[in-house]
A protein has these predicted regions:
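Conserved N-proximal alpha/beta basic substrate-recognition cap immediately N-terminal to
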Residues: 1-48
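Proline-centered loop/turn at the N-terminus of a beta-strand
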Residues: 9, 36, 56-58, 133
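A short acidic, often aromatic-flanked loop/helix-cap motif at beta-alpha or helix-coil junctions
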Residues: 17-20, 45-50, 65-67, 101-104
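Short, hinge-like loop/turn segments at secondary-structure boundaries
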Residues: 27-31, 56-58, 76
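Short, basic, helix/turn surface patches
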Residues: 37-45, 60-73, 164-167
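Acidic/histidine-enriched active-site and ligand-binding environments that engage anionic O-linkages
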Residues: 49-59
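Phosphate-binding site of ATP-dependent enzymes
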Residues: 61-147
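C-terminal active-site "lid" helix and adjoining low-complexity regulatory extension at the edge
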Residues: 132, 141-183
């Protein structure tokens, strides 16, 4: 943030980091940019989730300091457990989405991933929009269609030697294109 205040270009921007770490804002911005998303509901009410989305549902934390991914609830007791866990003992709301297909989580490195074509397109579009170089994307595959559901930071222990080579190659490419890339 200090570099941004001084007028330096920072990738990703503080705004993009904050927005992408809050699932409802991530989904809203993604949908506005044409990235496929599913309907979502931000609430702390089990009753509202059941009434509006029914089962099964995917639950994401709204609190940006919880990086537990998501929880799937197929019944009321699982939904209560998910809200208690991801809502920090019901102190925070959660973001609920209908589960219509299969959940898939994968690494996105500078918008590249080793997935099917639809997932690669989502990865590229998310990178174009938020400029988050390293993240884990959570998507839902419904038939042949893929929908963005969430994003979370990658932990260092999740990066393989191959990933590190990809990162080095991408940084070298950015530098060759004349863009300043500070770490």
């Amino acid at each position: 943030m200090h570099a941004e205040i001084l007028g330096n270009t920072v990738i990703p921007s503080s705004e993009n980091i904050i927005d992408s770490s809050r699932t409802p804002i991530l989904l809203l911005r993604a949908a506005r940019a044409g990235i496929p998303t599913l309907p979502s509901l931000v609430t702390d009410s089990v009753k509202k989730i059941i009434t509006e989305l029914n089962f099964p549902v995917v639950i994401f934390a709204v609190n940006p300091f919880i990086y537990d991914g998501y929880k799937i609830a197929n019944n009321k007791s699982a939904l209560y457990r998910a809200l208690k866990s991801l809502g920090m003992n019901y102190k925070f709301a959660v973001c609920a989405q209908p589960l219509r297909g299969e959940m898939l989580s994968f690494k996105s490195i500078f918008g590249k991933c080793e997935q099917d074509e639809e997932s690669r397109i989502i990865s590229e579009k998310v990178y174009e929009l938020f400029k988050i170089p390293l993240c884990k994307l959570h998507v839902q595959k419904v038939g042949k269609k893929v929908y963005l559901c969430g994003l979370q930071p990658l932990r260092k222990d999740e990066l393989s030697p191959h990933d590190m080579q990809t990162i080095s190659r991408e940084i070298a490419l950015i530098s060759q294109q004349g863009e300043h890339f500070g770490v």
